[in-house]
Every structure is written in C-alpha cells, then in structure tokens.
C-alpha cells in the first residue's frame, strides 16, 4: 500500500489472446470482419485472479457491490494480438462518492509505454440494495 492508501500490485504479465480478443470484439458489438483487439480489451484483465480477488476483498470490507461507473483508455501505441505486455495496477478508495478507482499502466516487455487505463466502480452498500428491494 502506498502513502496515499493506494493498493499497488506487482507487475502482471498479460497477453492479448487472439481467441479472447475476437470473442470480446463480438461481445462489444464489432462485426466478424474486425481483426484486432478493441481499445477496451484491457478490461478483461480485471478478471485475473489477482485483480478480481482484490476488488472482491475491497467490496467485502465495504459491505458493498461494485457497479461499473466508467472506463477510460488512452494509448501511446495500438494493442497487438498475440503480444505479451506488463500490466501495473493500483487501486484506491474514494469516499464521496464511495467508489473504487482502478488505474493501470500497460508497457511492452522492454518497458515502452503502451497505454493508461482507468476504471471507476461505484461501491453501492448492500444495505441500500436490501432497503430498495423491500420498498
């Protein structure tokens, strides 16, 4: 954890998998002729056990459910299908509004910057969900 309370992870080796990129492209509305990785493809890396597990623990500690609020992707160079990259991720909580900010930097294996990504997850208290379900 950093001085400002952010949780930082060791760099993760990730790959733009051809089959997963094609599946993700179809899931996000690209037609079958699209050949590449959608710019939002790095969202799939949030499901890695390390990142997903941390999000789940933070939500459990906050007795909250994560609701996707927004994402932002900015690139220095395009993603290449079949390439391996190093992904550095940090997370921090914000109280007003209650949310989890997930920030990531993607680099080539020789350290050249590829892109920056940010995902905002609103932390909705489970008590509010139960209250709304009863109303």
Show which residues each predicted segment covers:
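Hot-dog-fold acyl-thioester-processing enzymes
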Residues: 1-70, 131-135
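HotDog/MaoC-like acyl-thioester-processing domains
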Residues: 75-135
């Amino acid at each position: 954890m950093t001085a400002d309370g952010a949780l930082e992870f060791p760099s993760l080796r990730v790959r733009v998998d051809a089959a997963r990129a094609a599946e993700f492209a179809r899931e996000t509305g690209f037609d079958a002729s699209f050949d590449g990785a959608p710019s939002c493809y790095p969202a799939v890396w949030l499901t890695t056990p390390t990142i997903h597990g941390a999000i789940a623990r933070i939500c459990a500690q906050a007795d909250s459910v994560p609701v996707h609020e927004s994402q932002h992707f900015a690139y220095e160079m395009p993603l290449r299908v079949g390439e391996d990259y190093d992904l550095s991720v940090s997370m921090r909580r914000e109280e007003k509004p209650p949310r989890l900010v997930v920030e990531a930097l993607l680099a080539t294996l020789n350290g050249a910057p590829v892109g920056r990504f940010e995902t905002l997850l609103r932390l909705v208290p489970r008590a509010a969900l139960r209250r709304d379900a009863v109303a």
